[in-house]
Amino acid sequence: DRDAQTLTDERSDQGDGNFRYEFETSNGIYTQKTGTPGSEGQSNHQGSFRFTLEDGTIAEVTYIADEYGYQPSSDLLPVPPPAPPHVQRLLEIAAEQRAQGITFD
């Protein structure tokens, strides 16, 4: 959108790995994130972004990125179906066996 105006553009960097960033335009694009030093030497990020889809609905994603990887969350992301009952039962049995100290190589 050529006519979009920047409404917000705020940046703060402490220089020690801590930072905050926020950006918003008049056409509905928005992003914000914060960062902190991570326990494994990485930079931990937490944030969100949103934009308007062609049908007028708002797409929004929140996320965490840390030593466990990128972990997005959104109603737009596909969700796998639940495991069938027999698989759920097998997982319960495995958890019970681990609690009893049983291990499998």
From Swiss-Prot:
Tissue: Arthrodial membrane.
Pfam families the record matches: Chitin_bind_4 (PF00379)
InterPro entries reported in the protein's UniProt record: CHIT_BIND_RR_consensus, Cuticle_Struct_Prot, Insect_cuticle
GO molecular function, one term: structural constituent of chitin-based larval cuticle
Annotated region described as Disordered, given as residue ranges: 1-21
GO cellular component, one term: chitin-based extracellular matrix
PROSITE patterns the UniProt entry points to: CHIT_BIND_RR_1, CHIT_BIND_RR_2
Domain Chitin-binding type R&R stretches: 16-81
Keyword entries, A-Z: Cuticle
Protein name: Cuticle protein AMP1B
Lineage: Eukaryota, Metazoa, Ecdysozoa, Arthropoda, Crustacea
